[in-house]
Amino acid sequence: MKTDTTLTEKFNKLFQDGMLVFVHVGKWEMTQAVDQEKDLGLKAEDVPDFIMPGKKKLFPDEIRLQFSRIEQRGRTYLRDNSLKFPIVDAHFVPHRKLVEVYDGLTKIKEEYDKAVVAFLANYEKYKAEMLAAHHDNRASLEDCYPPVDLIKDRFRFEINMCEIAFPRKLKAVSIVQVRAQNLAVEKMQAKFEAAQEAHHREMNETAEKFVKAACMDLRSQVVATFQTIADKIANKEVVTKTNVKSLREIIEQFSSLDFYGDAEVQAKLLEAKALVKNDVVYKDDAAAVAKLNEIVGSVLTVARNVSDVDAVTGEYFRRINLNPV
């Protein structure tokens, strides 16, 4: 049985156009499990405000939650500047946007690291303030604070990039393995190759579904933004500078994330880009509004048409298959 080497092509070649980016964040939650007998042997009105369901907060929320807020900003930034990939927490970023995204995440990482340094430097001060604020429950809190040296390694903000590829050749199956399983060499090899083929087919289906989903998602973002403008024009509302700015932003966003080449939508967006310049004012210019309405309608017509999505994604894979990995 001969393994079809073309089975790996779609998935491998997808990573000629971008990489997967992951953000991994670690933090100390600054809480401690509640001791049911020691902490909750109280009347409801006497439960101190540092106790929440099942846990005690060891610091005020403005200190405790700052790391989660920075983390969320990082994840939101990555989500907004990438295409969601069907692997947990993975985001596909086209090469043309990779440096921009990495630099943006690095700034957020630097903010996170700076907050960690400040927190650790002020750890004992924050602890003393918390104990003073809850003097009546000091005994319930004081033993909950670990030494600062034990918590500093819990904080991290990591930015990782990778591509996924599968081996072009089968790994040899040792005779020891064959004998151990009491199988003939031929049968073992056939079984292994069949499993590899099935896995490669699954990965290529994943690549196809991802590109199709990316195409649909980017088009839907364009539709949402342009439809807002179409509605304003239809309702005879003023098209503001903020509205025009949103059009320019979605056009740039589409251009930076469209690694697969959605040519027809790109062409219409370029027409719109030429029209919505910084110096155009639509407030009292009926002719300008009419032109804008025409191009907005043209973009919406093309972006809403999903009948060509299979053709767009199919052409992308035909194109990259002409180039060796």
Per-range role (PLM):
Residues 176-259, 265-268:
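A contiguous, surface-oriented mixed alpha/beta subdomain in the mid-to-C-terminal portion of proteins
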Residues 103, 110, 186, 201, ...:
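Generic alpha-helical secondary structure signal
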Residues 236-325:
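C-terminal structured domains
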Residues 105, 109-112, 116-119, 123, ...:
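Short amphipathic alpha-helical coiled-coil/interface segments
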Residues 148-194:
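Acidic, low-complexity proline/glycine-rich segments
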